[in-house]
Amino acid sequence: MAKEHYERTKPHVNIGTIGHVDHGKTTLTAAITKVLSEKGLAKASDYADIDAAPEEKERGITINTAHVEYETEKRHYAHIDAPGHADYVKNMITGAAQMDGAILVVAATDGPMPQTREHILLAHQVGVDYIVVFLNKTDLVDDDELVDLVEMEVRELLSEYDFPGDDVPVLRGSALKALEGDAEQEKVIMDLMDTIDEYIPTPERSTDKPFLMPVEDVFTITGRGTVASGRIDRGEIKVGDEVEIVGLKEDVTKTTVTGIEMFRKTLDVGEAGDNIGALLRGVNREDVVRGQVLAAPGSIQTHKKFKGEVYILSKDEGGRHTPFFSNYRPQFYFHTTDVTGVIELPDNVEMVMPGDNVTFTVELIEPVAIEKGTKFTVREGGHTVGAGVVSEIDD
């Protein structure tokens, strides 16, 4: 008998659990898979499986992350849960797992704690725009007014970081009780999933976004012209499309794609994820260099100054052994090339220690095609010493 073909009929959304240590993120993740598995929508993962997250390397940084997947009636979800606080910080900054939305878990017994605040700040900085709150362990609080107070605090904290604190959905329950099979708490988990279905919008598909391809290599085909090759980051490109060559120079060059090749075969359309070569009309070999991008006209500009949210590797991770101060000049690796930049630390930060995460301003010596959300690594002598994401354009 022929195997059943997997139909990707439901829209796909990436989410994750965030919040303070021991507030119940992993227990909630396990409870979601258990409750949905009883409806045939997931494979139940127990706490120990999720907690023993495998190590992954993303841009030279080791991160522990657990991935589970499940479905609701409406959608397919990939859900990430990281065991340690440092893993969360690294995960959100490197974008190892891009989240479309997050479930903020706050124990009603404790209320918001330091990492609650830090995870909300990080979510804001790296562009996770939608948060649903789960007030956990409410079975351990006798007084409902105390839970109301915690909810109010969480809403205020979200508003402080530009989330719509008054409108964010807040659910109350006990992840542990749901995991143990308490019918009332299992219903709360289903309500949570319904809320996530409704509140967190389906992300725009990568192929629907404006075309962007970082240039990795440039070569000439005699008699035909100049080819720029690389992996398409987002969007799609068709033969005959106009593109701009952006970055590393003040001027933007406009050109038309007259041919697309992949694996030595010609293509009509290249899309996000494809490694292609694009033949560019009327462009000289020296007009395109590695580190520039090909982009849909008007979709991205060059900038020299930006704010970045950055994780600095610890000594054990192969990072620096000593702190750095303002005016530190490392290389910033954007897309496919290194550009030197000068770091300016915020007024309240005297120095940055290996293992810290920090927001700082960078002024690059050459203009680079970047926007809010562009990922980069910080390098020194060819070694990665940090990873970051552009949180704001400053020039």
Swiss-Prot record:
Mg(2+) binds at T26. It is an enzyme of class 3 (hydrolase). Residues 136-139 are annotated as: G4. GTP binds at residues 19-26, 81-85, 136-139. One of its GO terms (cellular component) is cytosol. Residues 19-26 are annotated as: G1. Residues 81-84 are annotated as: G3. Belongs to the TRAFAC class translation factor GTPase superfamily. Classic translation factor GTPase family. EF-Tu/EF-1A subfamily. Monomer. GTP hydrolase that promotes the GTP-dependent binding of aminoacyl-tRNA to the A-site of ribosomes during protein biosynthesis. HAMAP family: EF_Tu_B. This is Elongation factor Tu.
